[in-house]
Amino acid sequence: MSAIITSKFRLDTTEKFVDSLASNTFYMGLGRSNSWPDDTTPDDPYENDYTINTLWENMFAMKKCESVDIIYSSPRTLWTSGVTYSDYDDRDVNIEGKNYFVVSDNNNVFMCLKSGGVSTTNPDIAGVTTSGVIDHASTDGYIWKYMYTIPVDTGSKFLTASFIPVQYLTSAPDPGSDTALLNQWSVQDNAIDGAIYAIKIVSGGTGYTSAPTVTVSGNGTSATATATVTGGVITDIDMTGVGANYTKAVITVTGGGGSGASLRPVIGPSGGFGKDPRNDLRSHYVTI
């Protein structure tokens, strides 16, 4: 019987490890006084007896790790013009291996909800938008969701060339807190559970002479969309209302003089995008 280790399982395991620092004592060992062949890229660690023995032999100091010395993290992808980014897809079995979220030069983190090919418009242009989406459909076709900004203190301690720190706020920050924390709390508070931010075109159909009617049916409410037809084929779907509380939905296409179109919804995670960025960004890594 086949089985998989799910992202949720990995995140739960990571959470248990992070929480364990409050009641257990961990130390980080420091060693190897001689340089690596390339100091910016040390050798990959391996889990075998030889490596473990070598680590102990080279160790010359240990640092106690407190609960404030560890944070969830996700791979760092800096937004760069001319790059094609993947959009979030609730049915993509390889989503964790794709660049579906980015960090800007200002340490703002954005998730891609709709890809438009080569990205040319920096999502950072819109700045901090704690509700709704950043719609660049008229420029490069992308739609982004602002997730959070890495606080200055957090970034100076945990931001690396390969990973970004990710945190979930369990309570509202004090009014005088870092603006980044206040903005993140606003994003978490404004998250819409079960919203449909995108509809995928499985087949564009044929013979459409006008835009057909797109209907969203499911266990949620208020999701609406319109279709764009080019050359008799449905080529784009625009969400005019993302709705709420969907866990399942079916998209039907009627009218327009054509046939054969097939569409499917992309439903957001439990709680909505931004409610818990650790879940959205698959943060089953830690930075110490």
Question: Which stretches of residues belong to each language-model region?
Answer:
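Conserved, function-critical positions that sit in or immediately flank catalytic
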Residues: 140-288
